[in-house]
Amino acid sequence: MNYEIFKAIHGLSHHNSVLDSIMVFITEYAIVAYALILLAIWLFGNTQSRKHVLYAGITGIAGLVINYLITLVYFEPRPFVAHTVHTLIPHAADASFPSDHTTGALAISIAMLFRNRKIGWPLVIFGLLTGFSRIWVGHHYPVDVLGSLVVAIIIGFLFFRFSDLLRPFVDLVVRIYEAIINKLTKKPTDQNF
């Protein structure tokens, strides 16, 4: 059934160059988009927003670590290795399950959703689209994306639930950053001589 759903989704590719280009763009640049979004929130947000960015980034990294650990005990070949699949773009023949792109995107998104729904929901939708694009281009099975969603939800929940353990580190990083920025942007005082 996993392969049948994969064929149904991937079978939509190679018919419309505009849709293919959109899916390739998403699959190749989603992680860059997430990095830029988090950077913008960090640079233009307030203290609380910066803390949210750190929690989201740490959660994303933790999700990728979990993915790596999964690949040490379970290896699923990619669809284009196990079957005749014409991918839209090339990819290494490494482990298919779970999808790193999708896990990273959704772990960041879910972490942000727990802290700021207004920003979190669009990120979750984009994360799901990222997972869909991975199937569309022929790099992952649907179960790979579903596995990524499960990893992201579990990691996102755990890191939110136990965020007090990270709070001293997060607070310290934000305080140091804001102290540096305040020092750099402080206007010199006029002195009468």
Swiss-Prot record:
It comes from the Bacteria. One of its GO terms (cellular component) is plasma membrane. The keyword Glycosyltransferase does not apply. Keywords: Antibiotic resistance, Cell membrane, Cell shape, Cell wall biogenesis/degradation, Hydrolase, Membrane, Peptidoglycan synthesis, Transmembrane, Transmembrane helix. It is a multi-pass membrane protein. Disruption phenotype: Disruption results in a marked decrease of resistance to bacitracin. GO terms for molecular function: undecaprenyl-diphosphatase activity. Induction: Expression is sigma M, sigma X and sigma I-dependent. Induced by vancomycin and bacitracin, via sigma M. Expression is maximal during early exponential phase and decreases during stationary phase. One of its GO terms (biological process) is regulation of cell shape. The chain crosses the membrane at residues 24-44, 53-73, 119-139, 140-160. The keyword Flavoprotein does not apply. It is found in: Cell membrane. InterPro entries: P_Acid_Pase_2/haloperoxi_sf, P_Acid_Pase_2/haloperoxidase, UPP_Pase. It is an enzyme of class 3 (hydrolase). Bacitracin is thought to be involved in the inhibition of peptidoglycan synthesis by sequestering undecaprenyl diphosphate, thereby reducing the pool of lipid carrier available. Belongs to the BcrC/YbjG family. Catalyzes the dephosphorylation of undecaprenyl diphosphate (UPP). Confers resistance to bacitracin. This is Undecaprenyl-diphosphatase BcrC.
